[in-house]
Swiss-Prot record:
Positions of ATP binding: 539-546
Protein name according to UniProt: ABC multidrug transporter mdr2
Induction: Expression is up-regulated during biofilm growth. Expression is also induced upon amphotericin B treatment. Expression is down-regulated by tetrandrine and posaconazole in a synergistic manner. Expression is increased in clinical azole-resistant isolates.
Organism name: Aspergillus fumigatus (strain ATCC MYA-4609 / CBS 101355 / FGSC A1100 / Af293) (Neosartorya fumigata)
Residues annotated as glycosylated: 147, 303, 352, 421, 508, 692
A GO biological-process term: oligopeptide export from mitochondrion
Membrane-spanning residues: 182-202, 220-240, 307-324, 326-346, 422-442, 445-465
Length: 791
């Protein structure tokens, strides 16, 4: 809040030295004159100008100035009315307002013929203030310093520079399936060899048929024609069987690789720390686990097989073409360099487009996952059209990228196809002349043309193989980045925890969230919780109450200082075994799809049925008996089939079944009705008499009173107060007393200040004024909210 020394910039003639109260306010309100006024009008003005009075009283010696403004407001207004005073005074109110701005327009009044009405005088200024919204505070500047080192790159760690290293690593994924892939490759050689023998056989058949017509021959390769055709049919059948074996082996291997990839990546994702999930969107992770793994699996199985088949067929085709005619082969060789160059640039373009498509598919998955997961909220605000439009906009982006990919593919394949057709035409022209000259036979020309078609098809196959391989490299680079990412807090390293009993001590703990390192949550936080006690942690919203639970669970590590349990630093403990000793019930409980029994047993997977029933009874889950299937009732996704209170009681049972050494209750009864809360609290009270240490993050007075010790967190990230309820309540000026008064008042005082005309949201909590003689001017509770006539 700006102080009284800023006055000279808007009040000419005033200096920063102390000014007598009457002179100061006489300068501020030159049109105020001393005539009698009604008490109600005076109180109306007191409400109107209370924001400034409180601000000035906080910046100066309060009593003289409060007396001065009381004297001025006790007087009547001269014939010019309030409107002559108010504009200048409004600037004073704005001067002393805090950085927080009210979202509601400021209410200004003027007098017209004795009737107070709302003027249009300051509408432009009010509109400008509303458009500005909230002024940024110093904390906002700190929050702007974002650390996203844990965020995965959109194109993977290698980005657009992915090359041979990524290709080799991609192929190594298939190493466990090497034997099956070798068998598939053997089948590939058999089927490709048989396929490539067909053109040669057809050429010989044509030459034999021509010779039989002219010379009467009826044998082929030393076999009669019927025997030759029978043998050829058997060979083709063998080729089909080999092709069948190749396809089915590769499909099975591909599915196995995809399943292994998904399992490994999901496990790697699940062990990441909280910083990782703070920085990455769930939709992008789902996209990597689903579509990216499919692309990679296809790339190293089916696509690899197609590429090898194209390579074998192409090599055999070019070799047999050279055997038939070197002259015709040299003509065909002229086509290879431009096709190879075009295939190279085509593959690069497809790789970049594939990355963009996968990135946008991740965004699309994120939109669908978030919106469908919160569909009731969208429907409650009638936001269906907005969300469908948002989804369609992303679909349109993917469509445009797909259209661009189609255009590039069509251009490449059509141009290479046209070049191939022109080459065939040239071969027919040259080959026809060679047949006429007797250099080659008609059968040899036919075989050569068929080998040309096979070789051309192989070239197309290699181009497709390269483009699909680049897609796989793009997807694999995204998977490798996730696979290589090591969590900052490993859940499996450290000393295993046999027991988490003992005092809990925070020693000089300083902490900021990793994604917002410049915004400190705690500064030299120190407190100790004795073993077996019930401690309530209270404080303002955003003060770090739930952060204490996150640090104890080792979701985050302190920036400075240390946290001890039983005298041992938790950073040296195995996080997974420590979490097994801690039970937590959050304010917004999360249930998983499955039965009630499965959700309760989630805290202890090997729990017996009797243990599940006992935990449910402790948590007052009698509502289970109202379901036809009892404990086997399906709760639906995220517990959608249950009410909020029912979900919370199941969450309490899930924590109790662990019999944890440390129980953290983060507003655990916030969703319960009064009767259920009483029953659950009774159960918790009986439970807490044991050796369990309980930390209650509380706002409700009933929870706070039940605690042995109360720790009050201050806005500066330190402990403001600590003690029992009786001790802290006995301190009238203590932080706990003020916090409780604020909560129990329901915010009425601040609401009154926020609704006061011409008073932006200010920090004052009391605005009683005093007259010159020291008597208080009390608030007139009968003043209506609408402006009244000033007599």
């Amino acid at each position: 809040m700006r102080g009284i020394r800023s006055l000279p910039c808007w009040a000419p003639g005033l200096s920063t030295k102390r000014i007598p109260p009457r002179e100061l306010f006489a300068d501020l309100f030159p049109n105020a004159c001393v005539i009698s006024a009604r008490h109600s009008a005076r109180n109306g003005l007191i409400r109107q100008f209370s924001g400034c009075s409180g601000s000035i009283s906080n910046s100066c010696n309060p009593r003289p100035y409060r007396s001065a403004i009381t004297s001025l407001l006790s007087a009547n207004v001269c014939s010019k009315g309030v409107s002559a005073v108010q504009p200048r005074f409004l600037s004073t109110v704005r001067l002393f307002s805090t950085s927080q701005r009210s979202l509601e327009p400021k209410s200004n009044v003027k007098s017209t013929g004795g009737q107070v009405v709302r003027p249009e005088l300051h509408q432009d200024q009010e509109h400008e203030d509303i458009e500005k919204g909230f002024e940024l505070s110093e904390r906002a500047a700190q929050a702007a310093q974002v650390n996203l080192s844990a965020k995965l790159a959109k194109d993977g760690a290698a980005g657009k520079k992915a090359g041979f290293k990524e290709i080799w690593r991609l192929l190594l994924i298939a190493r466990p399936e090497a034997k099956k892939l070798a068998l598939a490759f053997l089948f590939l050689l058999v089927s490709s060899g048989i396929t490539m023998s067909i053109p040669f056989s057809i050429g010989k058949i044509m030459d034999t048929s021509t010779k039989a017509t002219t010379e009467g021959g009826n044998e082929l390769f030393g076999l009669s024609l019927p025997m030759f055709y029978g043998a050829l049919a058997g060979i083709l059948t063998l080729g089909a069987a080999a092709n069948y074996g190749r396809i089915i082996i590769l499909r099975i291997v591909g599915e196995r690789i995809v399943a292994r990839l998904r399992s490994k990546l999901f496990r790697q994702t699940f062990v990441q720390d909280a910083e990782f999930f703070d920085a990455n969107r769930v939709g992008d992770l789902i996209s990597r686990l689903s579509s990216d793994t499919i692309i990679v699996g296809k790339s190293i199985t089916q696509n690899l097989s197609d590429g090898l088949r194209a390579a074998v067929s192409g090599a055999a085709g070019f070799g047999l073409m050279a055997y038939v005619s070197l002259k015709l082969s040299s003509i065909l060789a002229l086509l290879l360099p431009p096709i190879g160059l075009g295939a190279f640039f085509y593959g690069r373009a497809i790789r970049n487009l594939s990355r963009q498509i996968q990135r946008n598919l991740g965004t699309l998955t994120k939109i669908a996952e978030e919106r469908l997961g919160n569909v009731k909220t969208s429907q409650s605000f009638a936001g269906e059209v907005l969300e469908v439009r948002r989804y369609n906009n992303q679909v349109r982006k993917i469509f445009e990228l797909g259209k661009k990919e189609s255009l590039i593919s069509a251009t490449f394949f059509s141009s290479t196809g046209f070049a191939g057709n022109m080459t065939i035409l040239a071969l027919l022209y040259v080959g026809g002349g060679m047949v006429q000259s007797g250099a080659i036979t008609i059968g040899e020309l036919t075989s050569f043309l068929m080998y040309t078609a096979y070789a051309g098809s192989s070239m197309f196959g290699l181009s497709s193989f390269y483009s699909e391989l680049m897609k796989g490299v793009g997807a694999a680079s995204r998977l490798f980045e996730l696979q290589d990412r090591q969590p900052t807090i490993s859940p499996t390293k450290g000393e295993k925890v046999a027991s988490a009993r003992g005092p809990i001590r925070f020693e000089n703990v300083t902490f900021s969230y990793p994604t917002r390192p410049a915004v400190p949550i705690f500064r030299d936080l120190n407190f100790e919780i004795p073993q077996g006690t019930n401690v309530a942690i209270v404080g303002p919203s955003g003060g770090g109450k739930s952060t204490i639970a996150s640090i104890l669970l080792r979701f985050y590590s302190p920036t400075e200082g240390r946290v001890l349990i039983g005298g041992k630093d938790i950073t040296h403990m195995n996080a997974k075994s420590l979490r097994r000793k801690i039970g937590i019930v959050s304010q917004e409980p999360v249930l998983f799809s499955g039965t009630i029994a499965e959700n309760i047993a989630y805290g202890k997977p090997q729990a017996k049925r009797s243990e599940i029933v006992a935990a449910a009874r402790k948590a007052n889950c009698q509502f289970i008996s109202d379901f036809p299937d009892g404990l086997d009732t399906q709760v639906g996704p995220r517990g959608a089939q249950l009410s909020g209170g029912q979900k919370q009681r199941i969450a309490i049972a899930r924590a109790l079944i662990k019999d944890p050494d440390i129980l953290i209750l983060d507003e655990a009864t916030s969703a319960l009705d009064a009767e259920s809360e009483t029953l659950v609290n009774s159960a918790l009270t009986a439970l807490l008499r044991g050796n369990n240490t309980t930390i209650s993050i509380a706002h409700r007075l009933s929870t706070i009173k039940r605690s042995d010790t109360i720790i009050v967190l201050g806005p500066d990230g330190r402990v403001a107060e600590q003690g029992s309820y009786e001790e802290l309540s006995a301190r009238p000026d203590g932080a706990f007393t003020k916090l409780m008064e604020w909560q129990m008042s329901g915010g009425e005082v601040m609401d009154q200040l926020a609704n006061t005309p011409a008073n932006p949201v200010a920090q004052e909590t009391s605005w009683d004024l005093q007259s010159d003689d020291g008597t208080e001017i009390s608030e007139d509770t009968n003043i209506p909210s609408e402006p009244r006539t000033i007599d």
